[in-house]
Swiss-Prot record:
GO terms for molecular function: carbohydrate binding; cell-cell adhesion mediator activity. It comes from Homo sapiens (Human). InterPro entries: Contactin-1_2_Ig1, Contactin-1_Ig1, Contactin-1_Ig3, Contactin-1_Ig6, FN3_dom, FN3_sf, Ig-like_dom, Ig-like_dom_sf. This is Contactin-1. A lipid is attached at S993 (GPI-anchor amidated serine). The gene is CNTN1.
Length: 1018
């Protein structure tokens, strides 16, 4: 073996062992050269578990594998750790994909993986299982009939045929396909074994049943022979207790999966099923089916592990079942390997850590072959260590792969990519670090010289392990030419730079402490001396954070008058601006800093630790802790309240009335009983009121008897033999307790004894007392008070009201009608003589409608007529009139009937010409012929109006034309409609204009045959 060693050149050797043991050595330029930027295979697609249906007509199956690599990778496949014979006609490769023609279960079922390799190494894909799916038919034998007494539970066994895989779904046919059983609380189909369970059999269950099995993996379904079910009638069905027959077992679930538990019970009556997690709340993702028999937990997590219980219960008894869900976890990376380059001869610890449940084990592959187990450490690496590595973390539930390429670097020192700075500046009295960072592998040894003098470590000079040179307490004599030498077993190199000594930067005018009040301005001075050959900048920081003058220019401003002056102006200072300000004067060589404190006096900060104690009906005790006084003593505290009925905070009355600044407890008084409150505390000093504390938790004061009487007590009116009493309900804040209501008291005006009734609805303000013996329009005294569970409140002032008057007893006479059109009828009548009439009501309904659906029109007692509108054309209507007052309506008049007229013509007049003649327009239209169900045309109405307005001049004519004046300015609209006994028909319109024409020309002739409007001027 020969090794090429070039000084100042990089040698990267990538060694790969792939199936046969070949070794490649590659030589590179400085780092990875332009002509060689290769890398080992990186998988982009890997094979997955595949189920091939045995009855498939496709005749082939594909396992995919694709990797990215430079140069392009070569692919191989292995099955059950043996090479796949790609020379066989049964196998072919499409890219990296393996295609198996005419798959055979005996030959092809097994575990496959793909190998991708190039001259950098080889990687192995994840393993994939190729299996063959099938679902055999049910046996051809007939199923025996099943006889069950009504009211008893029963199970029909599915007994599915041989199959793979196990992900079957089950349904049951009733009598014929595709009539499937609907699951409910009484009937259940287990998706675990396929059995049909009926909690108690009914006569309606009679029929022939077949188990219908589907395999979604191979898209095949089969069904069993039909099982006759014959319920045996019972004179009386006996109840029996719940008996759980579908029981879930302990489950091992993988985190992130969906878990289904089944629980079903027989019993009469049908048992109710309840689910719970023992000693813990149910998972938030849990769902229970409508029937209650299925519990599904979606996206199960580790914290969902535990014991789950289902309980079935009916009136005769209950049954319970418990089992545990164990939640396991697929491996997941905590830390994995990545492509790495290391120096030859160095050590490498390659961390590869995974979590999972159970805890995964770690094993390693190198170039596709087993290499190591557990933690991987390489010592004194050589070229033989280069290659493609794979870290595999696996537990019971699967494996995850992390792939990486390890390259070994061998390089003589070179400064070509990173030479020393030609000029290094350092301040007198300061410290400088001169970097020396050549590329080299293995790591070189470093030495330094100044001019012709070799440097060694001393109290001022230190050569770092990475080659950097540190000089402390710099003097003018330290200036000069410095050279760094680097040497390893592959060569040596050096680089030179010049150290220039500058004057140090010094703060000559430092900021001083300041004390201001909120809203005032403050100035922080700062000036510095520095080397005139350098540029000086000032940086201000506040409490350790650099001030951004662009974002914070509202409050911060710098003085740029002199280069050596970095004065800071703080404008309109707020409490948040109090703290330590640091001025840093800096050049590219060094810096100097000085600090000062700014005190901002202002209103106090918010009190803390607010607590509510000793809650009573109208007061509560509060305690709190002092907040910041912001450099001005707190003089007093204010307690504020907010009720559930308001969004506004209000100052509360307190005991003591004035809460001194040294107090940390007080009572809020004069509160509303049985009211929800929040409280907060505000501190005040000579500079103002501060921020409020965080509001307390909402509390409710104790209840108390009402102390406010209802207002606006009155009433009267209503129906016959009624006394209506009204009041203004008390608002929620005056309820003062639970079970709030009203006590209504009333008596005849000259009576002695008050009658009292209780109204329990707190929101009502009305009570109606009915008494058939009550005389109409009788005076009563009434009063109202509120009550709650704590007692009664005061009565309101006594009000005097009258009981309801009697409804009118006379019916209107001389009722008549006049049919106005197809949609309107006018009704008139003679007034009744009774004085108690307040209004008249007209009831009307079409002959084809029921009287109960009658429409009503109400008019005042002064009216003698009313108009009924929006009626149907050519329709018979029945009409009656009654006199009314607040007690109701009296007897109706004799019912009369009327027929609306036929509908007006639906055909609009067709305007055939609009001719200008001198100072007038002549508009002509065709005669409108009414249909058989329409009113005969009796004439025409013409509306002449300005365009855009609704009002104008209305003309009536029996002719088919009309003359209208030429508009003086603007456009006018001429609307023409037919008129009939049934009303006005549909409108036609034409626009005319008074604008002059350029010459006598066509101006206004409508050619009827072609629908063309042409104009003529004479």
């Amino acid at each position: 073996m020969k090794m090429w060693l070039l000084v100042s050149h990089l040698v990267i050797i990538s060694i790969t062992t792939c199936l046969a043991e070949f070794t490649w050595y590659r030589r590179y330029g400085h780092g990875v050269s332009e002509e060689d930027k290769g890398f080992g295979p990186i998988f982009e697609e890997q094979p997955i578990n595949t189920i091939y249906p045995e009855e498939s007509l496709e005749g082939k199956v594909s396992l995919n594998c694709r990797a990215r690599a430079s140069p392009f990778p070569v692919y191989k496949w292995r099955m059950n750790n043996g090479d796949v014979d790609l020379t066989s006609d049964r196998y072919s490769m499409v890219g990296g994909n393996l295609v198996i023609n005419n798959p055979d279960k005996q030959k092809d079922a097994g575990i496959y993986y793909c190998l991708a390799s190039n001259n950098y190494g080889m990687v192995r894909s994840t393993e994939a299982t190729l299996s063959f799916g099938y679902l055999d038919p049910f046996p051809p034998e007939e199923r025996p009939e099943v006889r069950v007494k009504e009211g008893k539970g029963m199970v029909l066994l599915c007994d599915p045929p041989y199959h793979f895989p196990d992900d079957l779904s089950y349904r049951w046919l009733l009598n014929e396909f595709p009539v499937f059983i609907t699951m409910d609380k009484r009937r259940f189909v287990s998706q675990t074994n396929g059995n049909l369970y009926i909690a108690n059999v009914e006569a309606s269950d009679k029929g022939n049943y077949s188990c219908f099995v589907s395999s979604p993996s191979i898209t095949k379904s089969v069904f069993s022979k039909f099982i006759p079910l014959i319920p045996i009638p019972e004179r009386t069905t006996k109840p029996y207790p719940a008996d759980i027959v579908v029981q879930f077992k302990d489950v091992y679930a993988l985190m992130g999966q969906n878990v289904t538990l089944e629980c079903f019970a027989l019993g009469n009556p049908v048992p109710d099923i309840r689910w719970r997690k023992v000693l813990e709340p149910m998972p938030s993702t849990a769902e229970i089916s409508t029937s209650g028999a299925v519990l599904k937990i979606f996206n199960i997590q580790l914290e969902d592990e535990g014991i789950y219980e289902c309980e079935a219960e009916n009136i005769r008894g209950k049954d319970k079942h418990q089992a545990r869900i164990y939640v396991q976890a697929f491996p997941e990376w905590v830390e994995h390997i990545n492509d790495t380059e290391v120096d030859i001869g160095s050590d490498l610890y390659w961390p590869c850590v995974a979590t999972g449940k159970p805890i995964p084990t770690i094993r390693w592959l190198k170039n596709g072959y087993a290499y190591h187990k557990g933690e991987l450490r390489l010592y004194d690496v050589t070229f033989e260590n280069a290659g493609m590595y794979q870290c595999i973390a696996e537990n019971t539930y699967g494996a995850i792969y992390a792939n990486a390429e390890l390259k070994i670097l061998a390089l003589a020192p070179t400064f070509e990519m990173n030479p020393m700075k030609k000029k290094i500046l350092a301040a007198k009295g300061g410290r400088v670090i001169i970097e020396c960072k050549p590329k080299a592998a293995p790591k070189p040894k470093f030495s330094w010289s100044k001019g012709t003098e070799w440097l060694v470590n001393s109290s001022r000079i230190l050569i770092w392990e990475d080659g950097s040179l540190e000089i402390n307490n710099i003097t003018r004599n330290d200036g000069g030419i410095y050279t760094c030498f680097a040497e390893n077993n592959r060569g040596k190199a050096n680089s030179t730079g010049t150290l220039v000594i500058t004057d140090p930067t010094r703060i000559i005018l430092a900021p001083i402490n300041a004390d201001i009040t909120v809203g005032e301005n403050a100035t922080m001075q700062c000036a510095a001396s520095f080397d005139p050959a350098l540029d000086l900048t000032f940086v201000w920081s506040f409490n350790g954070y650099v001030i951004d003058f662009n974002k914070e220019n509202i409050h911060y401003q710098r003085n740029f008058m002199l280069d050596s002056n970095g004065e800071l102006l703080i404008r309109n200072a707020q409490l948040k601006h109090a703290g330590r300000y640091t001025c840093t004067a800096q050049t590219i060589v060094d810096n100097s800093s000085a600090s000062a404190d700014l005190v901002v006096r202002g209103p106090p900060g918010p009190p803390g630790g607010l607590r509510i104690e000793d809650i009573r009906a109208t007061s509560v005790a509060l305690t709190w802790s002092r907040g910041s006084d912001n450099h001005s003593p707190i003089s007093k505290y204010t307690i504020q309240t907010k009720t559930i009925l308001s969004d506004d905070w209000k100052d509360a009355k307190t005991d003591p009335p004035i809460i001194e600044g040294n107090m940390e407890a007080a009572r809020a008084v004069d509160l509303i009983p049985w009211m929800e409150y929040e409280f907060r505390v505000v501190a005040t000093n000579t500079l103002g009121r501060g921020e409020p504390s965080i509001p307390s938790n909402r509390i409710k004061t104790d209840g108390a008897a009402p102390n406010v009487a209802p207002s606006d007590v009155g009433g009267g009116g209503g129906r016959n033999r009624e006394l209506t009493i009204t009041w203004a309900p008390l608002s929620r804040e005056y309820h003062y307790g639970n079970n709030f209501g009203y006590i209504v008291a009333f008596k005849p005006f000259d009576g002695e004894e008050w009658k009292k009734v209780t109204v329990t609805n707190p929101d009502t303000g009305r009570y109606v007392h009915k008494d058939e013996t009550m005389s109409p329009s009788t005076a009563f005294q009434v009063k109202v008070k509120a009550f709650n569970n704590k007692g009664d409140g005061p009565y309101s002032l006594v009000a005097v009201i009258n009981s309801a008057q009697d409804a009118p007893s006379e019916a209107p006479t001389e009722v008549g009608v006049k049919v106005l059109s197809s949609s309107e009828i006018s009704v008139h009548w003679e007034h009744v003589l009774e004085k108690i009439v307040e209004s008249y009501q007209i009831r009307y309904w079409a002959a084809h409608d029921k009287e109960e659906a009658a429409n009503r029109v109400q008019v005042t007692s002064q009216e003698y007529s009313a108009r009924l509108e929006n009626l149907l054309p050519d329709t018979q209507y029945f009409i009656e009139v009654g006199a009314c007052n607040s007690a109701g309506c009296g007897p109706p008049s004799d019912m009369i009937e009327a027929f609306t007229k036929k509908a007006p013509p639906s055909q609009p007049p067709r305007i055939i010409s609009s001719v200008r003649s001198g100072s007038r327009y002549i508009i002509t239209w065709d005669h409108v012929v009414a249909l058989s169900n329409e009113s005969t045309v009796t004439g025409y109405k013409v509306l002449y109006r300005p365009d855009g307005q609704h009002d104008g001049k209305l003309y009536s004519t029996h002719k088919h034309s009309i003359e209208v004046p030429i508009p003086r300015d603007g456009e006018y609209v001429v609307e023409v409609r037919a008129h009939s006994d049934g009303g006005d028909g549909v409108v036609s319109q034409v626009k005319i204009s008074g604008a002059p024409t350029l010459s006598p020309s066509l101006l206004g002739l409508l050619l009827p045959a072609f629908g063309i409007l042409v104009y003529l001027e004479f």
